[in-house]
């Protein structure tokens, strides 16, 4: 604080000049508080002030402040700077907690005061809000919790009663259906006996048609089985709700009635039990996975196991790394500094597009997650949890009563006895009366709450998908950046080992129990399994293909991709690590100057997300801004695709030809045709020099980069394809009985005409416009390896009404799937159903497939024309060259910033592979080493010969001739071009194994564009009289100079050895190395009461009990399948095939079996990111100021007990 270093001493006693008016906050507090209740307890003696009050008195007052007393002897403070008075000591902001959540023991937060009155006793003053109250504010939250618990118990009991009534009505429906089934069965038996005892013939003695009776019996049997499954499921849900309500009632009796407050030892015992339960749950989850694997193996042993598996399980579920396959691993001995040959990287120009595109997609995914979080926070503030479920139960009760009433009316119409008819009539009249009352009392708010709950479920589903996509992009970005790993100096060999502890400590304690660990993630209603074949990316309407509307690869859920990004500056990081500051083009910034971020910084994923967030994206936004400033209006936000034969506006047939075979290589250089994506509409004049240099930290070793020639483009199957157009063989048949359209996809002919990449599979997606939103309208075939021809031979049953059949058109999408599970649209075939006269019989026809390729040939031609015009017009050439230089410099800057983070990303990736034992061991070693490093760090910094050096950038502009739309574009199949490594590759400069202090210098060095402001502020540099250059050992040709201080290693060279700022309730740091400030978890920010501890304990016990029940159900299911297998059954039992939930369970077991360790780690990373996003939603609720975050979280806690989480369905009985 500014007044800690000096200021006016406070003066005790009367001030020199009394304040002209009493303190503004004195008048409200000096008024007598409201009269206490009739029975006022004996006033307790005023408690001694906490020790922190004495600490506040020991500090000097800030400059311009004075302490004084009023006529009653009360102390107040005068601020001569603003000429105001206050009851609050300004030093309390340093020594006292700010909120009740930060209080320890009997502390009161800033602005609160305990006052004793002779008549009333002890009361409390809130000087900030100018209020007084009799109740202790430290106990007020506990009473509020008890009140909310009692209110929720009333709502939960009403919902439980409605659930019980639903179960009873469904039980009545089941009994009626069972009675009808028995009567039909008895009727069939009587008729068969009458037929057997008669000798006059079948037609004269049978009262009913036996085939009709058997069909009716089969229909009633299916209905009876369905009702029995619903009863079993409802009984399970009812048991969960009953146990939850009983648990809450027991907590209410224990905590509210007797006012139980836990002591320290009791609270410690509860936390110990929570950690024990957490370990037991982890063990149970492992056993659950083992049981699922055994179930999958058992299912595969049956013949009809294919009936329960999904057609999409053939897709590889693992997330691979593009470009990693076939990369040879190179190793070297880094024991000597002169043994290092530079950087083992591919050509950065080939990696730049992928990295920038991934950065952009990652940024868009994070923005989508943030948008969904905002919407969820607003929705959760508007509704109570579990209120919509209770409203839905009431509506379901009305529907069940209506169904029972209809069944009673049908039964009464049949011939029954007089007693049965009278009993059923009385039941019918009672139901009609109850329905009239229910409809009269149904409120409009119930419907609105149900709609809000449906919207919340949809948003939670989108949040899960968006976090999964973000985690996938993050892993891809990390792998891509780590694949271009740079080698640091040999003198910094121990930097990785010394930094391991920071990662391990940031991962959090293994024994910590968070809110999501106890109560789990937010739950939502899963969609039906019937929609499992829905398309995983947004389909393009076929009618929009004829227009010149650009569309892009949709990598995620709907609304994820945008046609054009805004020009706002993303919040990216400028300098990512002190260790990488020497290899970056921007001056290092101090992490202590970073603003307080809203997200938690504890997890490695969060740190990695921030490290991957910024470099490419910042340059991309700058590039767009500069392009806009230069007047370039031809920069589309995303690459457009057009099918063959569908030209856009203003394009003729001559523009759809192949690209020119050669391009002039002179002042304008055309890159290789990854550059079909890279050509701008105007030619870019660049320098043809290729030069990248590595900086070996503080060793002074400077060697040019040795390029590698393994960076070859992917061959495309289309290069050797025949000239025949692709065609698909499809058969159509209308099933009038079930009102379905049978689509028989036979084979795909001439698939070589499609641009299928290597190692990609091909599948067909069938799309028919749906009748309503709840009907599945998209179906997917199995993915097949590329071959000629592709034989699918699959039949899809699509529900469609016969009257609407001729008005629809069937669309077949030919897609390819990469090993990284990326889908790419290859072609579309449209089938107009009106062209088929009659579909009563299967009709087979060949349909042509319109192939989708890049629209870059037109841009290539335009670029060539622009190059010719620029050759004729020198002025035009100069203007284009000016624009190109700015863009080229920015792209070169992007490359350098991306390289700066590569080492740290690779280290992070390696650290994540450590086991828990290794992490604990590294934590212990770091604790021992930090005490030594603290004492020796200052001496090392003096002995190392600190000097100032000039950070420079690569001397030559990197040749980047590409369009912005290509950077963000669709990943097309790569094609060979004239600018390939084999044709144009400079020979590497050979040097000896000594310290290289010589290199070529540019006579003129272009200045870099000034770095844009970022989220991290610049640290103040060391300023010395002269700049020392260490014999030109660093990259020459400085473009943007700054001063950097070097120690023995560059790990701490970018920060000052100053103390960290004071942070309350945190451990004293025992190292001077700066680390990212981390926010405490959600549980630590909240004031935890005894009621919270009891709820956490009971919730953990509930989760453990539910997990044990699931394990028992899985063991029983495995035992039943094993018994069926021992009896010699070759097919799955019928009770498995009839239950859709059991089939879904077996599909999930099959998916987990096909999962690899890498897939499992990616799934865990996605789940961890979803937990983090859920915590941030709670923080956003508190920021809205509608309700405190404690209130929202407590409501979620109590709603956990009455919200059933059924993951394993109950096993059905084989009989009815």
From Swiss-Prot:
Name of the protein in question: Protein WWC3
Organism: Homo sapiens (Human)
Region Interaction with PRKCZ, annotated ranges: 1060-1079
GO biological process, one term: cell migration
Lineage, highest ranks first: Eukaryota, Metazoa, Chordata, Craniata, Vertebrata
Key words of the record: Coiled coil, Cytoplasm, Repressor, Transcription, Transcription regulation
UniProt xrefs under SMART domains: WW
WW domain segment(s): 59-92, 106-139
Region feature Disordered, mapped onto this chain: 1-63, 487-508, 546-612, 634-668
Coiled coil (UniProt feature): 164-250, 354-468, 885-936, 1091-1160
A single cellular component GO annotation: cytosol
Family that this chain belongs to: Belongs to the WWC family.
PANTHER family on file: BOMB/KIRA PROTEINS (PTHR14791), PROTEIN WWC3 (PTHR14791:SF25)
SUPFAM superfamilies tied to this protein: C2 domain (Calcium/lipid-binding domain, CaLB), WW domain
Cellular localization per UniProt: Cytoplasm, Cytosol
Primary localisation category: cytoplasm
């Amino acid at each position: 604080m500014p007044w800690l270093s000096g200021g006016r001493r406070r003066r005790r006693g009367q001030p020199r000049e009394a304040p002209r008016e009493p303190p503004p906050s004195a008048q409200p507090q000096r008024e007598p508080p409201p009269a206490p209740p009739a029975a006022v307890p004996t006033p307790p003696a005023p408690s001694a002030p906490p020790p922190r009050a004495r600490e506040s008195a020991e500090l000097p007052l800030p400059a311009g402040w004075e302490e004084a007393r009023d006529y009653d002897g009360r102390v107040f403070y005068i601020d001569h700077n603003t000429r105001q008075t206050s009851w609050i000591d300004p030093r309390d902001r340093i020594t006292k907690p700010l909120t009740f959540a930060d209080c320890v023991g009997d502390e009161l937060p800033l602005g609160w005061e305990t006052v004793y009155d002779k008549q009333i006793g002890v009361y409390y003053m809130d000087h900030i809000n100018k209020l007084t109250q009799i109740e202790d504010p430290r106990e007020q939250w506990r009473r509020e919790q008890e009140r909310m618990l009692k209110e929720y118990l009333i709502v939960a009991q009403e919902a439980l009663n409605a659930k019980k009534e639903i179960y009873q009505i469904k039980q009545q429906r089941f009994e009626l259906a069972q009675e009808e089934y028995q009567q039909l069965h008895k009727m069939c038996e009587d008729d068969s006996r009458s037929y057997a005892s008669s000798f006059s013939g079948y037609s004269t003695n049978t009262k009913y048609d036996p085939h009709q009776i058997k069909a009716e019996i089969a229909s009633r049997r299916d209905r009876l089985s369905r009702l029995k499954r619903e009863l079993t499921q409802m009984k399970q849900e009812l048991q969960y709700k009953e146990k939850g309500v009983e648990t809450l009632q027991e907590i209410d009796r224990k905590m509210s009635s007797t006012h139980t407050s836990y002591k320290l030892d009791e609270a410690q015992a509860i936390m110990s039990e929570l950690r024990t339960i957490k370990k037991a749950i982890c063990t149970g989850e492992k056993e659950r996975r083992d049981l699922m694997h055994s179930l999958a193996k058992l299912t595969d042993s049956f013949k009809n196991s294919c009936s329960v598996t999904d057609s999409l399980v053939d897709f590889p579920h693992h997330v691979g790394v593009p470009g990693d396959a076939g990369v040879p691993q190179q190793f070297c001995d880094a024991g000597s500094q002169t043994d290092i040959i530079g950087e083992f990287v591919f050509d950065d120009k080939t990696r730049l597009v992928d990295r920038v595109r991934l950065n952009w997609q990652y940024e868009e995914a994070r923005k989508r997650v943030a948008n969904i979080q905002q919407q969820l926070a607003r929705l959760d503030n508007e509704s109570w949890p579990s209120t919509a479920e209770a409203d839905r139960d009431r509506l379901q009760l009305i529907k069940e009563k209506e169904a029972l009433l209809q069944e009673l009316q049908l039964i009464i119409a049949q011939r029954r006895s007089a007693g049965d008819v009278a009993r059923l009539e009385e039941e019918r009249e009672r139901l009609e009366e109850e329905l009239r009352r229910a409809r009269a009392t149904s409120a409009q708010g119930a419907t609105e709450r149900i709609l809000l709950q449906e919207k919340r479920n949809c948003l939670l589903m989108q949040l899960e998908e968006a976090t999964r996509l973000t985690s996938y992009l993050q892993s891809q970005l990390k792998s891509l950046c780590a694949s271009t790993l740079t080698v640091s100096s040999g003198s910094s060999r121990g930097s990785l080992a010394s930094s391991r502890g920071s990662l391990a400590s940031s991962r959090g304690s293994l024994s910590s129990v968070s809110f999501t660990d106890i109560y789990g993630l937010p739950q939502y209603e899963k969609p039906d399994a019937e929609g499992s074949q829905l398309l995983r990316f947004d389909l393009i309407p076929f009618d929009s293909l004829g227009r010149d509307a650009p569309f892009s690869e949709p990598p995620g859920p709907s609304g994820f991709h945008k046609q054009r990004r805004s020009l706002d500056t993303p919040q990216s990081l400028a300098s990512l690590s002190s260790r990488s500051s020497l290899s970056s083009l921007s001056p290092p910034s101090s992490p202590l100057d970073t603003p307080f971020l809203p997200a938690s910084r504890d997890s490695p994923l969060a740190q990695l997300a921030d490290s991957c967030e910024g470099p490419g994206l910042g340059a991309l936004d700058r590039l767009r801004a500069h392009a806009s400033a230069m007047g370039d209006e031809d920069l589309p936000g995303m690459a457009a695709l057009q099918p063959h034969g569908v030209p856009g506006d203003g394009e003729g047939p001559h523009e759809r030809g192949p690209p020119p075979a050669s391009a002039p290589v002179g002042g304008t250089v055309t890159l290789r045709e990854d550059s079909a994506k890279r050509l701008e509409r105007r030619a870019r004049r660049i320098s043809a020099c290729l030069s990248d240099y590595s900086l070996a930290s503080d060793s002074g070793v400077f060697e040019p980069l040795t390029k590698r020639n393994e960076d070859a483009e992917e061959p495309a199957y289309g290069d050797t394809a025949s000239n025949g157009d692709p065609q698909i063989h499809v058969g159509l048949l209308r099933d009038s009985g079930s009102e379905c359209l049978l689509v028989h996809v036979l084979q795909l002919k001439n698939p070589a005409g499609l641009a299928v990449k290597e190692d990609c599979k091909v599948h067909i997606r069938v799309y028919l416009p749906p009748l309503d939103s709840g009907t599945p309208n998209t179906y997917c075939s199995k993915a097949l390896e590329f071959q000629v021809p592709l034989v699918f031979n699959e039949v899809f049953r699509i529900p469609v009404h016969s009257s609407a059949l001729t008005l629809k058109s069937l669309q077949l999408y030919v897609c390819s799937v990469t090993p990284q599970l990326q889908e790419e649209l290859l072609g579309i075939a449209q089938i107009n159903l009106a062209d088929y006269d009659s579909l009563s019989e299967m009709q087979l026809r060949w349909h042509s497939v319109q192939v989708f390729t890049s629209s870059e040939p037109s841009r290539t031609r335009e670029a060539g024309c622009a190059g010719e015009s620029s050759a004729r017009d020198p002025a035009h050439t100069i203007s284009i060259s000016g624009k190109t230089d700015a863009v080229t410099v920015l792209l070169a800057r992007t490359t350098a910033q991306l390289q700066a983070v590569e080492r740290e990303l690779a280290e992070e990736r390696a650290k994540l592979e450590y086991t828990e034992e290794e992490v604990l061991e590294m934590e212990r070693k770091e604790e021992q080493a930090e005490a030594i490093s603290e004492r020796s760090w200052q001496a090392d910094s003096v002995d190392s010969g600190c000097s100032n050096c000039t950070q420079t950038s690569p001397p030559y502009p990197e040749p980047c001739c590409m369009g912005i739309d290509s950077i963000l574009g669709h990943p097309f199949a790569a094609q060979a071009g004239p600018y390939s490594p084999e044709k144009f590759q400079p020979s590497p400069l050979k040097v000896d194994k000594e310290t290289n202090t010589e290199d070529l210098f540019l006579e003129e060095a272009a200045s870099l564009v000034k770095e844009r402001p970022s989220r991290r502020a610049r640290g103040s540099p060391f300023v010395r009289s002269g700049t020392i250059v260490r014999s030109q050992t660093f990259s020459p040709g400085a473009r943007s100079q700054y001063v950097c201080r070097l120690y023995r290693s560059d790990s701490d060279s970018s920060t000052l050895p100053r103390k960290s700022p004071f942070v309350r309730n945190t451990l004293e740091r025992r190292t001077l190395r700066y680390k990212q400030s981390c926010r405490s978890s959600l549980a630590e920010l909240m004031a935890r009461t005894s009621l919270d501890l009891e709820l956490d304990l009971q919730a953990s016990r509930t989760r453990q009990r539910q997990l044990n029940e699931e394990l028992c159900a899985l063991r029983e299911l495995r035992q039943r399948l094993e018994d069926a297998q021992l009896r010699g059954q070759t097919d799955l039992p019928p009770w498995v095939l009839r239950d859709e939930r059991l089939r879904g369970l077996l599909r999930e077991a099959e998916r987990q079996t096909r999962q690899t360790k890498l897939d499992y780690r990616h799934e865990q990373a996605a789940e961890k990111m979803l937990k983090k996003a859920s915590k941030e939603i709670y923080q956003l609720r508190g920021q809205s100021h509608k309700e405190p975050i404690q209130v929202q979280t407590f409501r979620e806690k109590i709603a956990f007990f009455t919200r059933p989480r059924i993951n394993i369905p109950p096993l059905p009985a084989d009989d009815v």
